[in-house]
Amino acid sequence: MAVPKRKTSPSRRNMRRSHHALGANSFIEDKDTGELRRPHHVDLKTGMYNGKQILTPKED
């Protein structure tokens, strides 16, 4: 079994974890409805994606 020969310093540990941060979600304004939605995702209110009807719209 592999065992570390030296203790990992907090600086090295934090440098290794520097790429683990979560980024903020991006939103775009929908051309048809004007609502905000995630890019490359289906609009859940209308059920449209890329100009095509994918899902049946939710009834409110």
Swiss-Prot record:
Coiled coil: none
GO biological process entries: translation
Keyword Protein biosynthesis listed: no
Basic and acidic residues compositional bias, start-end: 28-44
Region (Disordered) location: 1-60
A GO cellular component annotation in the UniProt record: large ribosomal subunit
Biased composition annotated in UniProt, kind: Basic residues: 1-20
UniProt keyword terms in alphabetical order: Ribonucleoprotein, Ribosomal protein
Name of this protein: Large ribosomal subunit protein bL32
Record organism: Caulobacter vibrioides (strain NA1000 / CB15N)
Phylogenetic classification of the source organism: Bacteria, Pseudomonadati, Pseudomonadota, Alphaproteobacteria, Caulobacterales
